Amino acid sequence: MSHKFLEPIKIGNQTVKNRVMFLAMAKNISNFDDSVSAKDIAYVESVAAGGVGLLVPGAMIVDPEWPSVLPLQPGIYDDRFIPGLRRLVLAAHKYDAKILFQLWHPGATNYSGIDPKTVDELTKDEIHAIQDKFVAAAKRAMAAGADGIEFQTCHGYLACQFISPLFNHRTDEYGWNKVEDPTRFA
């Protein structure tokens, strides 16, 4: 008897060998300079060797100017990280697994000692600058050979702060004036 989850699936222009996915989790094993560590590579390789079709190794920092709520995560905010990120891709591809890079920004959720309720609302220029950082990070993911990207939109981090009416009290085009407005950030 064949199980559907063991059959290949096409996602966009990618064919994933099965429907078993290993999704992102914080591991806190990258180097202190935000570069990919040997532990990161070993982790991806062990997950891929287990037979998953697609894996997301975890949150990748797109903006080093914001304090990280998740210490020791890999950076994707500078070209110097591309060689290490490429090693993650090769570790997954060695076992015919696809790999997506999760692009992440903490927003007001951080360990800086600042209460998230007191963080100033981003200006439109700041929003555009952060959007540009996401675009640059996506280009680095592709340069490293990643099979795709995932835009981190949960757990109260920056993207979630735009799409959730619990966080988003803006009155401009990024607020909740119309249902599509909060999605403008993405």
Q: What is the meaning of each model-derived region?
A:
Residues 1-186:
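Flavin-dependent oxidoreductase catalytic cores
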